[in-house]
């Protein structure tokens, strides 16, 4: 893995007591909190994973948690809209692995909003995207803002990958590309009911080396004015990740894409789900994935920079390397392949 500048992103080993930089809620009365979780799950006809995520956010106040659940469109949609059935995998079929079991194993994932909606130099930019993907050679690739026009360079990656599109033929869509050694069992697409921007949640279920893997790619609602829709979508995604993990003990899960999130919009994260950039050490050199100070493909944003693109993961890896790709300007058109940098994370067990 190589960085695009002279500063090599840090590689940080994750100790057992190291959690996300956002912090961990400590529970003083475990029995009392467990009782609240059971009561919440019984009243709402949900589960204790959902109960824990809401109760943690409101300081374990059961009444406030119930008010949040029944008063929020996000949770009503999660409860009422049967957007997806449960996983076909039986609970307990997958043995729970440790870092010691995986010693020497490495898996890489790249996520990139390739800005297909911008028609300027699109054919050239898509060729550059394909060239960079081949150079970095990730095992898994999440793409957002894919369009039918000038798609040929992406389609040609099928010589290296199995390609799954969310809703090809739509104005724009997402794609998941997996290496040929990845055995795909199922591909699902969930259309967000509250989206006015054709946004979806794309899920590929399969295995690699006998290990159960779930790949979850999304492009959440854009722009500050659509904060409520975006937060509801993110909450749904995290609930779905928690459900997958609960139904498939010992699985590997990777969730990411262009989340368009501001830090203050992040709701609770399920236990055991980590942010790859945080796991790699929170290096400020790799923080900003949409950086209009360094990337001038988009004008008029006065140097705004955001960490819109993120990867979350679940599994027994104990080392994460995180880098940004696509930061070289294309000589022929003097622009970058996209207004977003690609994020690339390599997970390993040492």
Swiss-Prot record:
Matching Gene3D superfamilies: DNA helicase RuvA subunit, C-terminal domain (1.10.8.10), Endonuclease/exonuclease/phosphatase (3.60.10.10)
List the subcellular locations: Nucleus; Nucleus, PML body
Site, Interaction with 5' end of substrate DNA: residue positions: 172, 290, 308, 340
GO molecular function terms listed in the Swiss-Prot or TrEMBL record: 5'-tyrosyl-DNA phosphodiesterase activity; metal ion binding; nuclease activity; single-stranded DNA binding
**An annotated GO cellular component:** cytoplasm
Residue span of the signal peptide, if any?
none
Instruction: Supply the alphabetized keyword list.
Output: DNA damage, DNA repair, Hydrolase, Magnesium, Metal-binding, Nuclease, Nucleus
Tell me which cofactor or cofactors this protein depends on: Mg(2+); Mn(2+)
Write out the GO biological process terms.
Answer: double-strand break repair
Q: Which residues form the active site?
A: 258
CDD domains, alphabetized: TDP2 (cd09080)
Record keyword Metal-binding present? yes
Residues at which Mg(2+) binds: 115, 145
List its EC numbers: 3.1.4.-
* Superkingdom, taxonomy of origin: Eukaryota
Q: Where is this region: Interaction with 5' end of substrate DNA?
A: 113-117, 219-224, 260-262
Pfam families per record: Exo_endo_phos, UBA_8
The free-text note explaining how the cofactor binds reads:
Binds 1 magnesium or manganese ion per subunit.
Q: Which PANTHER family match?
A: TRAF AND TNF RECEPTOR-ASSOCIATED PROTEIN, TYROSYL-DNA PHOSPHODIESTERASE 2
The protein's job, in short, is:
DNA repair enzyme that can remove a variety of covalent adducts from DNA through hydrolysis of a 5'-phosphodiester bond, giving rise to DNA with a free 5' phosphate. Catalyzes the hydrolysis of dead-end complexes between DNA and the topoisomerase 2 (top2) active site tyrosine residue. Hydrolyzes 5'-phosphoglycolates on protruding 5' ends on DNA double-strand breaks (DSBs) due to DNA damage by radiation and free radicals.
**Which family, according to UniProt?**
Belongs to the CCR4/nocturin family. TTRAP/TDP2 subfamily.
- In Swiss-Prot or TrEMBL terms, this protein is called 5'-tyrosyl-DNA phosphodiesterase
Organism of provenance: Caenorhabditis briggsae
- Organismal lineage: Eukaryota, Metazoa, Ecdysozoa, Nematoda, Chromadorea
């Amino acid at each position: 893995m190589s960085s695009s500048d002279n500063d090599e992103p840090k590689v940080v080993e994750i100790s057992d007591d190291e959690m996300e930089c956002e912090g961990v809620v400590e529970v003083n009365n475990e029995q009392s909190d467990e009782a609240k979780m059971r009561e919440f799950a019984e009243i709402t006809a949900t589960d204790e994973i959902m109960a824990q995520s809401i109760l943690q956010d409101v300081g374990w106040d059961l009444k406030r948690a119930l008010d949040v659940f029944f008063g929020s469109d996000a949770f009503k949609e999660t409860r009422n809209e049967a957007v997806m059935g449960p996983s076909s995998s039986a609970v307990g079929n997958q043995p729970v692995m440790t870092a010691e079991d995986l010693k020497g194993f490495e898996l890489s994932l790249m996520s990139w909003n390739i800005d297909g909606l911008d028609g300027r130099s699109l054919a050239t930019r898509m060729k550059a995207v394909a060239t960079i993907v081949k150079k970095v050679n990730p095992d898994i690739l999440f793409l957002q803002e894919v369009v039918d026009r000038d798609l040929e360079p992406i389609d040609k990656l099928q010589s290296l990958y199995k390609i799954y599109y969310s809703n090809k033929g739509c104005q724009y869509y997402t794609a998941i590309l997996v290496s040929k050694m990845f055995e795909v069992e199922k591909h699902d697409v969930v259309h967000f009911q509250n989206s006015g921007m054709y946004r979806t949640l794309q899920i590929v279920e399969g295995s690699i080396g006998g290990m159960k893997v779930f790949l979850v790619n999304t492009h959440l609602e854009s722009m500050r004015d659509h904060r409520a829709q975006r937060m509801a979508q993110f909450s749904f995604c995290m609930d779905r990740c928690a459900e997958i993990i609960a139904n498939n003990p010992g699985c590997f899960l990777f969730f990411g894409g262009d989340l368009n999130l501001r830090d203050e919009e992040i709701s609770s994260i399920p236990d055991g789900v980590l942010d790859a950039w945080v796991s790699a050490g929170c290096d400020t050199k790799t923080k900003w994935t949409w950086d209009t100070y360094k990337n001038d493909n988009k004008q008029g944003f006065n140097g705004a920079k955001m960490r819109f693109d993120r990867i979350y993961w679940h599994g027994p890896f104990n080392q994460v390397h995180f880098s940004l790709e696509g930061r070289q300007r294309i000589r022929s058109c003097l622009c970058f392949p996209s207004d977003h940098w690609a994020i690339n994370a390599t997970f390993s067990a040492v």
